[in-house]
Amino acid sequence: MAKVLYEKDIQDGVLKNKKIAVIGYGSQGHAHAMNLRDSGYDVVVGLRPGKSQEKAEEDGFNVLSVAEASSQADVVMVLLPDEMQPKVYEESIKDNLEQGNALVFAHGFNIHFTQVVPPANVDVFLVAPKGPGHLVRRTFEEGAGVPALYGVHQDYTGEAKDVALAYSKGIGAARAGVLETSFQEETETDLFGEQAVLCGGVTSLIKAGFETLTDAGYQPEVAYFECLHEMKLIVDLLYEGGLENMRYSISDTAQWGDFVSGQRVVDDQTKERMKSILDDIQTGSFAKGWILENQAGRPQFNAINRRENRHPIETVGRELRELMPFVKQPINAKKKDVNVHVPN
Protein backbone atom coordinates (compact mmCIF):
# COMPACT_ATOMS: atom_id res chain seq x y z
CA MET A 1 0.00 0.00 0.00
CA ALA A 2 1.39 3.40 -0.97
CA LYS A 3 2.32 5.74 1.85
CA VAL A 4 0.50 9.07 1.88
CA LEU A 5 2.18 12.05 3.54
CA TYR A 6 0.44 15.05 5.09
CA GLU A 7 1.49 18.49 6.35
CA LYS A 8 2.50 17.12 9.75
CA ASP A 9 4.94 14.74 8.04
CA ILE A 10 6.76 17.44 6.05
CA GLN A 11 9.48 19.86 7.14
CA ASP A 12 9.47 22.87 4.83
CA GLY A 13 12.54 24.73 6.06
CA VAL A 14 14.61 23.47 3.12
CA LEU A 15 12.56 25.67 0.78
CA LYS A 16 12.16 28.77 2.94
CA ASN A 17 15.17 30.75 1.71
CA LYS A 18 14.89 29.79 -1.95
CA LYS A 19 13.43 31.88 -4.76
CA ILE A 20 10.91 30.03 -6.89
CA ALA A 21 10.30 30.82 -10.57
CA VAL A 22 6.96 29.67 -11.94
CA ILE A 23 7.23 29.47 -15.72
CA GLY A 24 3.77 29.90 -17.19
CA TYR A 25 0.63 31.48 -15.77
CA GLY A 26 -2.16 29.31 -17.08
CA SER A 27 -4.42 27.00 -15.10
CA GLN A 28 -1.70 25.40 -12.98
CA GLY A 29 0.77 28.29 -13.17
CA HIS A 30 -1.43 30.89 -11.53
CA ALA A 31 -2.51 28.42 -8.82
CA HIS A 32 1.04 27.37 -7.94
CA ALA A 33 2.34 30.94 -7.93
CA MET A 34 -0.46 32.31 -5.75
CA ASN A 35 -0.49 29.40 -3.31
CA LEU A 36 3.29 29.48 -2.88
CA ARG A 37 3.21 33.23 -2.30
CA ASP A 38 0.42 32.87 0.25
CA SER A 39 2.54 30.20 1.95
CA GLY A 40 5.29 32.77 2.43
CA TYR A 41 7.62 31.94 -0.44
CA ASP A 42 9.49 34.35 -2.72
CA VAL A 43 7.91 33.80 -6.14
CA VAL A 44 8.72 35.30 -9.53
CA VAL A 45 6.78 34.51 -12.72
CA GLY A 46 8.47 33.88 -16.07
CA LEU A 47 6.44 34.82 -19.16
CA ARG A 48 6.53 36.48 -22.53
CA PRO A 49 4.59 39.74 -23.06
CA GLY A 50 0.86 39.20 -23.44
CA LYS A 51 -2.40 38.66 -21.59
CA SER A 52 -0.86 36.22 -19.12
CA GLN A 53 1.78 38.79 -18.22
CA GLU A 54 -0.88 41.43 -17.66
CA LYS A 55 -2.89 39.05 -15.46
CA ALA A 56 0.16 38.04 -13.40
CA GLU A 57 1.10 41.68 -12.89
CA GLU A 58 -2.47 42.50 -11.87
CA ASP A 59 -2.17 39.70 -9.32
CA GLY A 60 0.87 41.44 -7.88
CA PHE A 61 3.71 39.30 -9.21
CA ASN A 62 7.10 40.40 -10.46
CA VAL A 63 6.96 39.20 -14.07
CA LEU A 64 10.19 38.64 -15.97
CA SER A 65 11.18 36.88 -19.17
CA VAL A 66 11.61 33.13 -18.82
CA ALA A 67 15.38 33.54 -19.04
CA GLU A 68 15.52 36.26 -16.39
CA ALA A 69 13.21 34.41 -14.03
CA SER A 70 15.22 31.20 -14.42
CA SER A 71 18.51 32.97 -13.77
CA GLN A 72 17.22 34.52 -10.54
CA ALA A 73 15.60 31.41 -9.10
CA ASP A 74 16.81 28.47 -7.05
CA VAL A 75 13.75 26.41 -8.01
CA VAL A 76 12.34 26.58 -11.55
CA MET A 77 8.86 25.09 -11.97
CA VAL A 78 7.97 24.60 -15.65
CA LEU A 79 4.20 24.84 -16.10
CA LEU A 80 3.98 25.16 -19.87
CA PRO A 81 2.23 22.76 -22.27
CA ASP A 82 4.30 19.63 -22.93
CA GLU A 83 4.89 20.50 -26.57
CA MET A 84 6.34 23.93 -25.70
CA GLN A 85 8.70 22.84 -22.96
CA PRO A 86 11.69 21.49 -24.95
CA LYS A 87 12.18 24.64 -27.02
CA VAL A 88 11.64 26.96 -24.07
CA TYR A 89 14.06 24.89 -21.99
CA GLU A 90 16.78 24.98 -24.66
CA GLU A 91 16.37 28.68 -25.44
CA SER A 92 15.61 30.24 -22.07
CA ILE A 93 16.17 27.90 -19.12
CA LYS A 94 19.07 25.53 -19.78
CA ASP A 95 21.88 28.09 -19.74
CA ASN A 96 20.45 29.86 -16.70
CA LEU A 97 20.47 26.88 -14.36
CA GLU A 98 23.19 26.92 -11.72
CA GLN A 99 24.73 24.10 -9.75
CA GLY A 100 22.35 22.92 -7.04
CA ASN A 101 19.23 24.47 -8.58
CA ALA A 102 16.03 22.46 -8.87
CA LEU A 103 14.19 21.95 -12.16
CA VAL A 104 10.57 20.97 -11.54
CA PHE A 105 7.67 19.70 -13.63
CA ALA A 106 4.01 18.86 -13.06
CA HIS A 107 4.08 16.07 -15.65
CA GLY A 108 6.94 13.75 -16.51
CA PHE A 109 6.49 13.55 -20.29
CA ASN A 110 9.53 15.51 -21.47
CA ILE A 111 11.95 14.09 -18.92
CA HIS A 112 10.77 10.50 -19.36
CA PHE A 113 10.87 10.70 -23.15
CA THR A 114 14.19 12.66 -23.10
CA GLN A 115 12.85 15.77 -24.81
CA VAL A 116 14.41 17.74 -21.96
CA VAL A 117 17.80 16.53 -20.72
CA PRO A 118 18.89 18.51 -17.64
CA PRO A 119 22.53 18.90 -16.59
CA ALA A 120 23.80 16.46 -13.99
CA ASN A 121 24.42 19.13 -11.36
CA VAL A 122 20.79 20.07 -10.67
CA ASP A 123 17.91 18.38 -8.88
CA VAL A 124 14.98 17.28 -11.02
CA PHE A 125 11.60 16.36 -9.54
CA LEU A 126 7.91 16.57 -10.24
CA VAL A 127 4.92 17.74 -8.22
CA ALA A 128 1.69 16.83 -9.97
CA PRO A 129 -1.61 17.96 -8.40
CA LYS A 130 -4.45 15.59 -9.30
CA GLY A 131 -6.86 18.33 -10.22
CA PRO A 132 -7.14 21.44 -12.42
CA GLY A 133 -5.49 24.70 -11.41
CA HIS A 134 -8.68 26.51 -10.44
CA LEU A 135 -9.42 23.71 -7.96
CA VAL A 136 -5.85 23.80 -6.61
CA ARG A 137 -6.33 27.50 -5.91
CA ARG A 138 -9.91 27.38 -4.63
CA THR A 139 -9.36 24.54 -2.19
CA PHE A 140 -6.21 26.24 -0.91
CA GLU A 141 -8.19 29.41 -0.16
CA GLU A 142 -10.79 27.27 1.62
CA GLY A 143 -8.11 25.79 3.87
CA ALA A 144 -8.01 22.44 2.08
CA GLY A 145 -6.07 21.16 -0.91
CA VAL A 146 -5.87 18.85 -3.91
CA PRO A 147 -3.84 15.63 -3.56
CA ALA A 148 -0.61 15.44 -5.53
CA LEU A 149 2.03 13.02 -6.72
CA TYR A 150 5.72 13.77 -6.25
CA GLY A 151 8.75 12.03 -7.65
CA VAL A 152 12.49 12.55 -7.93
CA HIS A 153 14.33 11.97 -11.21
CA GLN A 154 17.70 13.39 -10.23
CA ASP A 155 19.00 14.13 -6.73
CA TYR A 156 22.23 16.11 -7.07
CA THR A 157 22.02 17.94 -3.74
CA GLY A 158 20.69 15.08 -1.65
CA GLU A 159 17.70 17.28 -0.78
CA ALA A 160 15.51 16.82 -3.84
CA LYS A 161 12.86 14.76 -2.04
CA ASP A 162 12.69 17.22 0.86
CA VAL A 163 12.35 20.17 -1.53
CA ALA A 164 9.67 18.35 -3.52
CA LEU A 165 7.68 17.66 -0.37
CA ALA A 166 8.08 21.24 0.84
CA TYR A 167 6.87 22.49 -2.54
CA SER A 168 3.89 20.12 -2.33
CA LYS A 169 3.08 21.54 1.08
CA GLY A 170 3.47 25.08 -0.23
CA ILE A 171 0.77 24.65 -2.86
CA GLY A 172 -1.58 23.04 -0.34
CA ALA A 173 -1.35 19.47 -1.63
CA ALA A 174 -0.14 18.05 1.68
CA ARG A 175 -3.41 19.12 3.30
CA ALA A 176 -5.08 16.43 1.18
CA GLY A 177 -2.14 14.05 0.91
CA VAL A 178 0.91 13.53 -1.32
CA LEU A 179 1.96 10.20 -2.77
CA GLU A 180 5.41 9.22 -4.04
CA THR A 181 5.79 8.09 -7.65
CA SER A 182 8.42 8.08 -10.39
CA PHE A 183 8.60 10.04 -13.64
CA GLN A 184 8.00 6.80 -15.54
CA GLU A 185 4.96 5.78 -13.51
CA GLU A 186 3.38 9.24 -13.50
CA THR A 187 3.89 9.72 -17.23
CA GLU A 188 2.74 6.31 -18.40
CA THR A 189 -0.29 6.05 -16.12
CA ASP A 190 -1.36 9.63 -16.83
CA LEU A 191 -1.21 9.11 -20.59
CA PHE A 192 -2.99 5.77 -20.34
CA GLY A 193 -5.78 7.19 -18.19
CA GLU A 194 -6.32 10.05 -20.63
CA GLN A 195 -6.31 7.87 -23.73
CA ALA A 196 -8.08 4.69 -22.67
CA VAL A 197 -10.53 5.96 -20.06
CA LEU A 198 -10.95 9.62 -19.15
CA CYS A 199 -10.79 11.27 -22.57
CA GLY A 200 -10.43 8.84 -25.46
CA GLY A 201 -12.43 6.03 -23.90
CA VAL A 202 -15.28 8.15 -22.57
CA THR A 203 -15.72 10.33 -25.66
CA SER A 204 -15.73 7.31 -27.97
CA LEU A 205 -18.23 5.51 -25.72
CA ILE A 206 -20.54 8.54 -25.62
CA LYS A 207 -20.47 9.01 -29.39
CA ALA A 208 -21.03 5.30 -30.04
CA GLY A 209 -24.05 5.28 -27.73
CA PHE A 210 -25.49 8.43 -29.31
CA GLU A 211 -25.01 7.05 -32.83
CA THR A 212 -26.56 3.70 -31.89
CA LEU A 213 -29.73 5.40 -30.66
CA THR A 214 -30.05 7.90 -33.51
CA ASP A 215 -29.33 5.22 -36.13
CA ALA A 216 -32.21 3.25 -34.60
CA GLY A 217 -34.54 6.21 -35.13
CA TYR A 218 -34.59 7.79 -31.69
CA GLN A 219 -34.61 11.57 -31.37
CA PRO A 220 -31.10 13.10 -31.22
CA GLU A 221 -32.14 15.27 -28.28
CA VAL A 222 -33.20 12.25 -26.24
CA ALA A 223 -30.04 10.38 -27.23
CA TYR A 224 -27.97 13.36 -26.09
CA PHE A 225 -29.59 13.38 -22.67
CA GLU A 226 -29.23 9.63 -22.18
CA CYS A 227 -25.64 9.27 -23.41
CA LEU A 228 -23.92 12.58 -22.58
CA HIS A 229 -25.88 14.96 -20.38
CA GLU A 230 -26.50 12.44 -17.59
CA MET A 231 -22.84 11.42 -17.54
CA LYS A 232 -22.12 14.15 -14.97
CA LEU A 233 -24.66 12.70 -12.55
CA ILE A 234 -22.90 9.33 -12.64
CA VAL A 235 -19.38 10.75 -12.57
CA ASP A 236 -20.21 12.85 -9.51
CA LEU A 237 -21.36 9.71 -7.68
CA LEU A 238 -18.19 7.87 -8.72
CA TYR A 239 -16.03 10.82 -7.63
CA GLU A 240 -17.70 10.99 -4.23
CA GLY A 241 -17.65 7.31 -3.33
CA GLY A 242 -16.44 4.99 -6.07
CA LEU A 243 -18.33 2.30 -7.94
CA GLU A 244 -20.16 1.11 -4.82
CA ASN A 245 -21.57 4.58 -4.13
CA MET A 246 -22.74 4.95 -7.71
CA ARG A 247 -24.46 1.57 -7.68
CA TYR A 248 -26.07 2.30 -4.32
CA SER A 249 -27.49 5.56 -5.68
CA ILE A 250 -28.98 4.34 -8.95
CA SER A 251 -32.11 2.23 -9.41
CA ASP A 252 -31.95 -1.55 -9.12
CA THR A 253 -32.96 -1.75 -12.77
CA ALA A 254 -29.99 0.41 -13.75
CA GLN A 255 -27.67 -1.63 -11.53
CA TRP A 256 -28.83 -4.91 -13.05
CA GLY A 257 -28.27 -3.44 -16.50
CA ASP A 258 -24.78 -2.42 -15.35
CA PHE A 259 -24.04 -6.00 -14.29
CA VAL A 260 -25.36 -7.84 -17.35
CA SER A 261 -24.66 -5.36 -20.17
CA GLY A 262 -21.55 -3.43 -19.17
CA GLN A 263 -19.29 -6.41 -19.77
CA ARG A 264 -20.78 -6.78 -23.26
CA VAL A 265 -19.55 -3.28 -24.11
CA VAL A 266 -16.17 -3.52 -22.40
CA ASP A 267 -15.04 -7.12 -22.70
CA ASP A 268 -11.77 -9.04 -22.83
CA GLN A 269 -11.10 -7.78 -26.36
CA THR A 270 -11.45 -4.21 -25.12
CA LYS A 271 -8.95 -4.95 -22.40
CA GLU A 272 -6.53 -6.38 -24.98
CA ARG A 273 -6.82 -3.16 -26.98
CA MET A 274 -6.16 -1.22 -23.78
CA LYS A 275 -2.99 -3.27 -23.33
CA SER A 276 -1.98 -2.31 -26.86
CA ILE A 277 -2.51 1.37 -26.03
CA LEU A 278 -0.40 0.96 -22.90
CA ASP A 279 2.30 -0.75 -24.96
CA ASP A 280 2.40 2.21 -27.37
CA ILE A 281 2.90 4.49 -24.38
CA GLN A 282 5.54 2.34 -22.72
CA THR A 283 7.61 1.89 -25.88
CA GLY A 284 7.52 5.59 -26.70
CA SER A 285 5.52 5.06 -29.90
CA PHE A 286 2.76 7.45 -28.82
CA ALA A 287 5.26 10.08 -27.69
CA LYS A 288 7.17 9.87 -30.97
CA GLY A 289 3.98 10.32 -32.97
CA TRP A 290 2.87 13.32 -30.88
CA ILE A 291 6.29 14.96 -31.12
CA LEU A 292 6.37 14.51 -34.92
CA GLU A 293 2.79 15.82 -35.20
CA ASN A 294 3.80 19.02 -33.43
CA GLN A 295 6.94 19.40 -35.53
CA ALA A 296 4.78 19.16 -38.66
CA GLY A 297 2.41 21.91 -37.47
CA ARG A 298 -0.36 19.61 -36.22
CA PRO A 299 -2.13 18.81 -39.52
CA GLN A 300 -3.86 15.67 -38.21
CA PHE A 301 -4.65 17.20 -34.81
CA ASN A 302 -6.36 20.21 -36.35
CA ALA A 303 -8.20 18.21 -39.01
CA ILE A 304 -9.56 15.73 -36.46
CA ASN A 305 -10.46 18.56 -34.10
CA ARG A 306 -12.50 20.30 -36.81
CA ARG A 307 -14.24 17.04 -37.73
CA GLU A 308 -15.08 16.22 -34.11
CA ASN A 309 -16.55 19.68 -33.54
CA ARG A 310 -18.98 19.02 -36.40
CA HIS A 311 -20.28 15.73 -34.97
CA PRO A 312 -24.10 15.74 -34.62
CA ILE A 313 -23.83 15.28 -30.85
CA GLU A 314 -22.06 18.64 -30.66
CA THR A 315 -24.69 20.39 -32.76
CA VAL A 316 -27.54 18.97 -30.69
CA GLY A 317 -25.68 19.63 -27.45
CA ARG A 318 -25.08 23.30 -28.20
CA GLU A 319 -28.77 23.80 -28.98
CA LEU A 320 -29.94 22.00 -25.84
CA ARG A 321 -27.51 23.76 -23.53
CA GLU A 322 -28.89 27.11 -24.65
CA LEU A 323 -32.20 25.99 -23.13
CA MET A 324 -30.55 25.09 -19.82
CA PRO A 325 -29.33 28.30 -18.10
CA PHE A 326 -28.31 26.25 -15.06
CA VAL A 327 -25.57 24.58 -17.13
CA LYS A 328 -22.33 26.53 -16.90
CA GLN A 329 -21.35 27.68 -20.37
CA PRO A 330 -17.87 26.72 -21.59
CA ILE A 331 -15.22 29.41 -21.93
CA ASN A 332 -14.51 28.32 -25.49
CA ALA A 333 -17.38 26.22 -26.77
CA LYS A 334 -15.74 25.65 -30.12
CA LYS A 335 -12.06 24.92 -29.81
CA LYS A 336 -9.95 26.63 -32.46
CA ASP A 337 -7.09 25.10 -34.37
CA VAL A 338 -4.00 25.00 -32.22
CA ASN A 339 -0.55 26.18 -33.17
CA VAL A 340 2.37 26.17 -30.80
CA HIS A 341 3.53 29.59 -29.62
CA VAL A 342 6.72 29.77 -27.64
CA PRO A 343 7.23 32.39 -24.91
CA ASN A 344 10.42 34.42 -24.73
Swiss-Prot record:
Q: Give residue ranges for domain KARI C-terminal knotted.
A: 182-327
Q: Cite the SUPFAM superfamilies for this sequence.
A: 6-phosphogluconate dehydrogenase C-terminal domain-like (SSF48179), NAD(P)-binding Rossmann-fold domains (SSF51735)
Q: Which Pfam families match?
A: KARI_C (PF01450), KARI_N (PF07991)
Binding of NADP(+), residues: Y25, G26, S27, Q28, R48, S52, D82, E83, M84, Q85, G133
Domain KARI N-terminal Rossmann: where?
Answer: 2-181
Detail which positions bind Mg(2+) 2: D190, E226, E230
The active site lies at: H107
| Enzyme Commission number | 1.1.1.86
Q: Which domain of life is it from?
A: Bacteria
> Could you tell me the keywords of this UniProt record?
Amino-acid biosynthesis, Branched-chain amino acid biosynthesis, Magnesium, Metal-binding, NADP, Oxidoreductase
Q: Which InterPro entries match?
A: 6-PGluconate_DH-like_C_sf, KARI, KARI_C, KARI_N, KARI_prok, NAD(P)-bd_dom_sf
Entry binding sites for substrate = S251
Q: What is the recorded function of this protein according to its Swiss-Prot or TrEMBL entry? A: Involved in the biosynthesis of branched-chain amino acids (BCAA). Catalyzes an alkyl-migration followed by a ketol-acid reduction of (S)-2-acetolactate (S2AL) to yield (R)-2,3-dihydroxy-isovalerate. In the isomerase reaction, S2AL is rearranged via a Mg-dependent methyl migration to produce 3-hydroxy-3-methyl-2-ketobutyrate (HMKB). In the reductase reaction, this 2-ketoacid undergoes a metal-dependent reduction by NADPH to yield (R)-2,3-dihydroxy-isovalerate.
Family matches, as PANTHER family: KETOL-ACID REDUCTOISOMERASE, MITOCHONDRIAL (PTHR21371:SF1)
For this chain, the family text in UniProt reads:
Belongs to the ketol-acid reductoisomerase family.
Q: Name the chain's protein.
A: Ketol-acid reductoisomerase (NADP(+))
Supply the source organism for this entry: Oceanobacillus iheyensis (strain DSM 14371 / CIP 107618 / JCM 11309 / KCTC 3954 / HTE831)
